[in-house]
């Protein structure tokens, strides 16, 4: 489990050059300043995975905890919680995009509206 903090922009992109496809996610970093990165590597013994799950999670978050279930108290005590006053609203969104890599070596940027800017190929 890993938390990425201090993000300047809210986006990531994963590419599969063999298939020529990628997946990108963009979000407002001022709302979700943390990216939680986790992996499941056949560790879940019970239903429904029975040691057969290989998964990677990349989740934009409002804050992070380091103590599992006791984490909410930790986040509040450290002042990292996202607080909404009674009646206050927060409307936000995430943008997910599937894109063609077009032989590009990688991704330069994913804009807030989900447009993927590929790196230039150097020959």
Specify the residue positions occupied by each region the protein language model found.
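A contiguous, surface-exposed recognition patch within enzymatic or periplasmic domains that forms
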Residues: 1-83, 89
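Non-catalytic surface loops within mature trypsin-like serine protease
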Residues: 29, 62, 96-102
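Short Pro-Gly-centered flexible turn/kink motifs
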Residues: 82-100
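Terminal connector regions
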Residues: 100-123
